[in-house]
Amino acid sequence: MAVNSSNTAPQLMKSCNDILLFIDRKNSPVYTEFILIYVKERYIMLDKKLKSAALLAIEKNAQRRVIPFIYNDINYYIKRRMSNGRNTFAKSSPDTAFYREAYKMLSVNEAVPLAPPVVLLCDDFIVTEDTGTPLQVVAKRLSVEESKNIFFNAGHALATLHSHGFWHGRPAIRDITWHGQEQKITFLDWENKVPFLKTDPQTIDLFLFLQSCFREEWPTNELIDSAVSGYLSLPSEKERFADVRAFIQDHSRIFAVCRVLSVFHWIDVLSVDMTASYVMNLSDK
């Protein structure tokens, strides 16, 4: 399925996205097989020395699913085709999740470099380059003033992803990295499926991104405001917040329950309520 013409790339991306949305929602073994064929035909990359280093790292960490290692003074990560033993609501079977993630990363990077660069793809594991520090850690290590521009870039990167017709699935700030030297945002962990079957996945993306920020219980909303400004800086995506507000209104009963339960300070529930309140009170810019 190799495509060399730049004129056919947009059509291919739309077709790939339509198929991927079906896979996310139906979790079909047939389309899982399609992903495997697509990935293998186009992207099998084999650096024998790198593969040997990766296999050695796996041998030393046989029970781990994600393994960092160093090869030729460069930091890499291995992600293996095995279950993490949790979060079955958001994630699929190990095989489906593995091939979905490979497909998503490679497809996204064809259009815009916002996924980790895949340097080695094997039947049972993927090797990607290290992409920097998670935003969750950035917010803890740096001052608010130092972090604002980084979160602006994160919001802009998410809008850029959406503007190309893609979505992440769960863009939590622990799975978004900042590479200071390259001044680059990267989204990790692409194996999540769409949890709300009748909702636009990009709308869910934006809500979950904000909710992951509110989970941190920062004393102010300055970093969240910066991320929102970054998202709104891409004109084509400005209407996305209206979609999020519509989503909240369409599921008002669920959010009303979250509001009542927020008094117990369960962070997952509280952060949902805080996100909904923030979005509903957000003025259009």
Map each language-model feature to its residues.
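Conserved kinase catalytic-core helix
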Residues: S107, A111-V112, V138-R174, L206
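C-lobe/activation-segment region of protein kinase-like
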Residues: T186, E191-D284
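ATP-binding glycine-rich loop module of kinase domains
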Residues: A62-A97
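Conserved protein kinase catalytic/activation segment
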Residues: D175-F187
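Conserved structural core of kinase catalytic domains
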Residues: P116-F151
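Juxta-kinase regulatory segment immediately upstream of eukaryotic protein kinase catalytic domains
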Residues: Y31, V39-A54
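The N-lobe alphaC helix and its flanking beta3-alphaC-beta4 segment of protein kinase-like domains
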Residues: S93-V108
